[in-house]
From Swiss-Prot:
Residues in Globin domain copies: 1-142
Function: Involved in oxygen transport from gills to the various peripheral tissues.
GO MF annotation, one: oxygen binding
Disulfide bonds: none
Binding site for O2: H59
PROSITE patterns the record matches: GLOBIN
Tissues in which the protein is found: Red blood cells.
Listed name of the protein: Hemoglobin subunit alpha
Cellular compartments per GO CC: blood microparticle; haptoglobin-hemoglobin complex; hemoglobin complex
Residues bearing PTM N-acetylserine: S1
Length: 142
């Protein structure tokens, strides 16, 4: 679980990086479909699933909107992300293992875009936070 120190670190990092959240989402999703091509199956209804395509950019923006929501609900991720969990479990039917894959890609992108801000301490806190987000999103699968 997230300590008060972790929560403060996530909020501080988010304040800095949120201005670039659309680019982070696009890059993370683009990276995910290249490095983990099996994830493309969830987007097979899109006409263009190439990195940086309009659909990838738009969905990356949605993903980062969800992360922004999670930051605002950091004290109770399970309740705060309930609707997103329902959507991913019952409508989109996303395998929850993919949340961890995307989290890894988000961490890589933030590390490359914000090397100064992405200290080891920020890394640990953000990793724990994203793991909590993945757990909250997987809640409705049980």
């Amino acid at each position: 679980s997230l300590s008060d120190k972790d929560k403060a670190a996530v909020k501080a990092l988010w304040t800095t990086i949120s201005k670039s959240s659309d680019a982070i989402g696009n890059d993370a999703l683009s990276r995910m479909i290249v490095v983990y091509p099996q994830t493309k199956t969830y987007f097979s209804h899109w006409p263009d699933v190439t990195p940086g395509s309009t659909h990838i950019r738009d969905h990356g923006k949605k993903v980062m909107g969800g992360i922004s929501l999670a930051v605002s609900k950091i004290d109770d991720l399970k309740t705060g992300l309930f609707e997103l969990s329902e959507q991913h479990a019952f409508k989109l039917r996303v395998d929850p293992a993919n949340f961890k894959i995307l989290n890894h890609c988000i961490l890589v992108v933030i590390a490359t875009m914000f090397p100064k801000e992405f200290t080891p301490e920020a890394h640990v806190s953000l990793d724990k936070f994203l793991s909590g987000v993945a757990l909250a999103l997987a809640e409705r699968y049980r």
